[in-house]
Amino acid sequence: MKRVFTLFFVLSLFCMLFGNIVLAADFPSKPIKLIVPWGAGGNADVQARILAKASEQFLSQPVAVTNKPGGATIPGVTESLQAKPDGYTLIWIAIPSVATQPFLRKTPYTLNDLYPLANVSRNTLVLYVRDDSPWYTLKQFLDGAKTQRIGMSLNAIGALPHLAAVELAKGAGVVFKYVTAKSSAGAVVSLLGGHVQAALAHEPQAFSHGKGLRALAVFESERSAYLPLVPTAKEQGYDIVGYVRDSVAINVKAPQEVKD
């Protein structure tokens, strides 16, 4: 059943992203580039590579995934917009992060420069500690943060995990030491390596590194179907909801027949 669902998921994405493009005359006539502005192994990277691999069965040209991590996704988004707007360069984006960056720092683009082709997934934020941590609840974790400066890894300053962490720290009256990684997966690797005491990362990391992690809180309005035993932050006194919508976008100046 899992394999059937995965196949259905991939085929649905393919139809959303490439259905109209395939109908366009002699398109594609060369490889399509899909820029992922995070490091290899993260949620976006894995999803992008599954989609790219599946598309090879339907397109006459491959979809090449290129990682452009760092800089809070700004370098990757910028590269996609600097490419010729002919429909051959796509960018994997995360909402709301791509929308907030132009307000947090100077960027050579705004959200209006991007045209979303399809929503791909919704990834909920989860607060993780190592499974040998002394903290078993969010309260214990925050009490610990009042007596020591806890290092917290996350994918980028200004991205949603960072904004959620700031909100949590403000509500609890504590201060975290933020350590950035190039992806959600990188944030968890930093935690497991003992470089920090906690990580705010996406839900799938619980399955990639489940044996070494303990989830303390899910930042959603209700408990996750995948982590049903983990209480929400709201249940534990902090009404913070944080999730990312991964989407594939293209330069708004791309041909209309590609965007339609």
Language-model segments: which ranges?
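Anionic-ligand binding region
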Residues: 186-241
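Short, solvent-exposed coil/turn elements at secondary-structure transition points
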Residues: 10, 69-71, 96, 120-123, ...
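Positively charged n-region of N-terminal signal peptides that target proteins for export
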Residues: 1-4, 235
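Bacterial N-terminal signal peptides
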Residues: 8-20
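N-terminal (or domain-start) structured segment
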Residues: 24-113, 149, 160-161, 170-200, ...
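Hinge/capping helix and adjacent helix->loop/strand transition within the periplasmic-binding protein
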Residues: 55, 79-88, 102-186, 235-238, ...
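Short secondary-structure boundary segments
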Residues: 94-95, 131, 202-204, 220, ...
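Structural signature of the Rossmann-like NAD(P)-dependent dehydrogenase/reductase core
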Residues: 33, 67, 151-154, 214-219
